[in-house]
A protein has these predicted regions:
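Bacterial Sec-dependent N-terminal signal peptides
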Residues: 1-24
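Sec-dependent signal peptide cleavage junction
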Residues: 17-57, 139-175
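N-terminal Sec/ER secretory leader and immediately downstream segment
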Residues: 27-97
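Compact alpha-helical subdomains of small soluble proteins
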Residues: 66-70, 74-168
Length: 175
């Protein structure tokens, strides 16, 4: 009995090891995988919306009416802040923003490149949609991108320099 259990465990571990797909190692491999992913409407068994309106349809299916009412009652800033680490993370992971998906690819075309910015955009736009407000997409995108740049600049401003190199240029020999 012990031997059968041991063999079964090793067999399962061996199959699990082979079932894992290695991440791309080169830029060309990454681009190839990315180009395949952005054409798919389904990643890992999860439907990927094609655009923002399709994302709204999916969120309406997944979120209960009472939860939508709670979400609507919050201010936009409060909703975006409170849901960033729950709904926002769910969106990033399940809709394939890190590895690329057709939805993240469409957002890149709008000027959003960071996965967290994309999820923030969806949360804020969904809040506006539920509250029957104008989406004002270009202004919203501009605000999100500016906030990302400002945060990045502040982080870099106070960051210590780990190593500084000085390039010595050899003097030209005179003839």
């Amino acid at each position: 009995m012990y031997k059968i259990l041991l063999i079964t465990c090793f067999s399962i571990m061996a199959f699990a090891g082979f079932a894992q797909k290695e991440p791309p190692e080169t830029l060309d491999e990454y681009k190839k995988e990315y180009n395949e992913r952005i054409k798919k409407d389904n990643l890992a068994g999860i439907y990927i919306p094609k655009d923002l309106n399709d994302a709204f349809v999916e969120l309406n299916k997944k979120i209960a009416d009472k939860d939508k009412d709670k979400f609507k009652s919050l201010s936009e800033d409060e909703a975006a802040h409170k849901l960033f680490f729950s709904l926002g993370r769910w969106i990033v992971v399940n809709w394939g923003f890190d590895g690329g998906s057709r939805l993240s690819h469409s957002f890149k075309g709008l000027g959003l490149f960071h996965p967290e910015d994309m999820s923030t955009f969806i949360i804020r736009a969904y809040h506006r949609k539920l509250n029957n407000k104008d989406l004002a997409m270009s202004e919203l995108i501009k605000t999100i991108v500016t906030a990302r740049k400002t945060t990045r600049a502040a982080d870099l401003k106070d960051a210590p320099v780990l190593h500084e190199e000085v390039r010595k240029i050899p003097k030209k020999k005179s003839k």
